[in-house]
UniProtKB/Swiss-Prot annotation:
Organism: Brucella anthropi (strain ATCC 49188 / DSM 6882 / CCUG 24695 / JCM 21032 / LMG 3331 / NBRC 15819 / NCTC 12168 / Alc 37) (Ochrobactrum anthropi)
GO molecular-function terms, A-Z: fructose 1,6-bisphosphate 1-phosphatase activity; magnesium ion binding
Name of one Pfam family that matches: FBPase
Cofactor dependency: Mg(2+)
Gene Ontology biological process terms from the UniProt entry: fructose 1,6-bisphosphate metabolic process; fructose 6-phosphate metabolic process; fructose metabolic process; gluconeogenesis; sucrose biosynthetic process
Protein name, UniProt field: Fructose-1,6-bisphosphatase class 1
E.C. number(s) listed in UniProt: 3.1.3.11
Keyword Hydrolase (UniProt): yes
InterPro entries recorded: FBPase_C_dom, FBPase_class-1, FBPase_N, FBPtase, Fructose_bisphosphatase_AS
Annotated positions binding Mg(2+) 2: D126, D129, E287
Cofactor stoichiometry and binding remark: Binds 2 magnesium ions per subunit.
Length: 340
């Protein structure tokens, strides 16, 4: 039996040979109409999706053409940069400039990259979230935020000025979650057609959750209030919370975001006593902000433990922040412990 030749996917009972769900591009065109700012936003999202399809293809090939996890440098925060980090950055910057963005802020560059002088939007992006998972089969993602480019420093605006935000999750399928301020939409990439098709609209988080996502290995470094939150949850139905909790931790914010948006849950990565973690670890502008925008659009919340993420005015491009997001009720409960 030969394994060479054209790839033909398994067809399951009940599968259709046609995908009739609306394409994301068509949705964006209808949403944008003739409005200039909306058209610029739609073009930027389309550019990101074009880049995501190319990135997905490279991820799928693993180490066959070369080692994507090869270390090639460090960024401004001394985080190690892999070959695929730099390649992803270059890809998205090139496509976003071609799409007319005024400027692009990437995790992999110290300063924003200038684009079209009269562009209407500014795009903040983490080209490849979770690159430590490269080669392990664990989740990877791209996450982005779009702001109006109507100030001298568009990336130092509070998150509540975002026009749109979204992420692409590279897992056993390539999935998109995004919002243009009219609810959260899910879509999946169809490799047969090269198109993202909408699979769910008006995604809504549940009212209650018993799923927690956090790095349990750092519990001893958390504040007394946060340690009490974890301990009370782990006591389950015999403790003050009165019900059992499950733990989920994927090691990539986009992966945890995608799971929580589908199943509910609460994620936290807050400040702790370790050197370098005093203000949290995730980036406010291009990680916490888009997550907070999507959480709000799905009926959830996102805070730094006490303040709404969307109300925080960044002071620097790569500012770090504590982040708590997910089901609104649980975010509020954690906030009570956080304040202790």
């Amino acid at each position: 039996m030969t394994m060479a030749g054209n790839f033909s996917p398994l067809v399951l009972v009940g599968d259709s040979d046609r995908v009739e769900a609306e394409a994301v591009g068509a949705y964006l065109d209808n949403w944008a109409g003739k409005d200039g700012l909306r058209l610029a936003t739609a073009d930027a999202i389309k550019a990101i999706l074009a880049g995501a399809t190319r990135l997905a293809g490279r991820i799928a090939r693993g180490s066959l053409p070369g080692d994507p996890g090869k270390l090639v440098g460090v960024n401004s925060d001394q985080d190690q940069q892999k070959c695929i980090d730099v390649g992803s950055h270059n890809l998205f910057v090139e496509l976003l400039i071609a799409a007319g963005a005024a400027s692009i802020l990437s995790e992999e560059a110290d300063l924003p990259v200038a684009g079209k002088a009269d562009g209407l939007i500014a795009v903040a992006i983490d080209p490849l979230d979770g690159s430590g998972n490269v080669g392990l089969g664990a989740p990877l993602g791209t996450i982005f935020s779009i702001f109006p480019a109507d100030t001298a420093e568009p990336f130092l605006q509070p998150g509540n000025r975002q026009i749109a935000a979204g992420y692409v999750s590279f897992g056993n399928s390539v999935d998109l979650g995004f919002s243009v301020g009219e609810g959260v939409i899910f879509a999946t990439f169809d490799p047969a057609s090269g198109i993202f098709h909408i699979t769910r609209r008006n995604v809504t988080l549940p009212e209650r959750t018993s799923d927690l996502a956090f790095n349990a290995s750092v519990q001893r470094h958390l504040s007394a209030g946060m340690q009490a939150y974890v301990n009370d949850a782990f006591l389950g139905k015999d403790g003050p919370r009165g019900r059992n909790f499950n733990m989920r931790w994927l090691g990539a914010a986009v992966g945890d975001m995608h799971r929580i948006m589908q199943r509910g849950g609460l994620f936290f990565y807050v400040n702790d006593s370790r050197p370098g973690y005093e203000k949290g670890r995730l980036r406010l502008v291009y990680e916490a902000n888009p997550i907070a925008f999507l959480a709000r659009e799905a009926g959830g919340k996102a805070t730094d433990g006490s303040r709404s993420i969307l109300d925080i005015v960044p002071q620097t491009y790569h500012e770090r922040s504590a982040l708590v997001f997910g089901v609104a009720e649980e975010v509020d409960i954690l906030g009570e412990y956080f304040a202790k």
